[in-house]
Amino acid sequence: MKKILLAFTLPLVLASQTAMADVTLKVPGNFEILAAQHLEIKKATKIVALPEGDQQVLVRFDSPTNPHSTGQSMGYVSSQPILIRFSANDGEVVKLVAPRVDTQQDVKRFAKNPSFELTDTAGKSVSFESEKLVVSGSPLMANYNDILAVQVAASTKQTLPQPAVITASSQSVSTVDINQLTPAQADQLMKDLYQNADKKSRKEFIRWALGL
């Protein structure tokens, strides 16, 4: 009887220990997790369990236009997805901590340029990098798992200098030496710069390219 009981309880204990050992990522009520590198997320969530190690996760700010309204008749305001890169050990609970947003003006302003930090189980800051992605089309139709997969693949190739990132303590801008790039790399870099530029910069780029 004891052997039978052990056979049933041991897998449950091991499964429980495995679940407890996962890295847990939590976001506040006005943020949501869209995609994670090591698992497929079918619906945006506020909490997710991740394996130990390096993480790449897509999140976004998503708040009622009026943060104090119960009916939400004014709709929601969302930011562009933000790619977060960080590392964590088994058993850690990593929390995304953002400043308080109280007014409609604050919500709209914050959605354009979200700011936050990551903390660990002890409440200490977790080092991370973040990059705001520009996704065209309707957010409802976007496949964020595919979008993240493209970013993960690009980061592993390392054929081109990485885009500027915002860290927990500083903001840096990558410097590119065009002379060190192959023609194919230079062509791809020009395409990336054009696609990520705003309308004004694109017009100036076209005028420069045409010699106007």
Swiss-Prot record:
- Keyword Electron transport in record: no
Q: Which UniProt keywords apply?
A: Signal
Q: Which residues form the signal peptide?
A: 1-21
Please, which domain of life does this record's source organism belong to?
A: Bacteria
Matches recorded under InterPro entries:
UPF0319 (IPR018635)
Q: Which family does it belong to?
A: Belongs to the UPF0319 family.
The record's section on HAMAP family has: UPF0319
Name of the protein in its database record = UPF0319 protein PBPRA2789
